[in-house]
Amino acid sequence: MHALQAKILDPRIGNEFPLPAYATVGSAGLDLRAMLKEDTVLEPGQTLLIPTGLSIYIGDPGLAALILPRSGLGHKHGIVLGNLVGLIDSDYQGELMVSCWNRGQTAFNIAVGERIAQLVLVPVVQAHFELVEAFDESQRGAGGFGHSGSH
């Protein structure tokens, strides 16, 4: 398991609400909580930038973090991430913020401390461009957008 430096920016974390933790041995994501000043209603079509009260520093350029939606919120209530996926670079040190979007038809109450997203660490491979005049042939070539077949 990798060590991840974290700073608690909201004193309610560690007191009223636990630090992010893996729910099971097989969990890939750490739950992030809505550290709002008060419960907030997210109206249909509305987006809101929600503080998590936590900052992290990954430090290792071979890693990054992704902020991903919690499946139950999207499926049951239409609450998804406004930017679909949040990418946290290894050298970022600011507060983790979650953009929530209500794509549903009804208002949704976000309670203080509610688990709203999850943080997943992923490996990163940095590449450089090697400029060429032509590519070696591949089976697919430049075909895209359904080129490989139908359902």
Curated annotation (Swiss-Prot):
This is Deoxyuridine 5'-triphosphate nucleotidohydrolase. Pathway: Pyrimidine metabolism; dUMP biosynthesis; dUMP from dCTP (dUTP route): step 2/2. The keyword tRNA-binding does not apply. CDD domains: trimeric_dUTPase. GO terms for biological process: dUMP biosynthetic process; dUTP catabolic process. It is an enzyme of class 3 (hydrolase). Its cofactor is Mg(2+). Its EC number is 3.6.1.23. SUPFAM superfamilies: dUTPase-like. This enzyme is involved in nucleotide metabolism: it produces dUMP, the immediate precursor of thymidine nucleotides and it decreases the intracellular concentration of dUTP so that uracil cannot be incorporated into DNA. It catalyses: dUTP + H2O = dUMP + diphosphate + H(+). GO terms for molecular function: dUTP diphosphatase activity; magnesium ion binding. The gene is dut. Substrate binds at R70, S71, G72, N83, L87, I88, D89, M97. Belongs to the dUTPase family. Disulfide bonds: none annotated. The keyword Magnesium applies. HAMAP family: dUTPase_bact. Keywords: Hydrolase, Magnesium, Metal-binding, Nucleotide metabolism. Pfam families: dUTPase (PF00692).
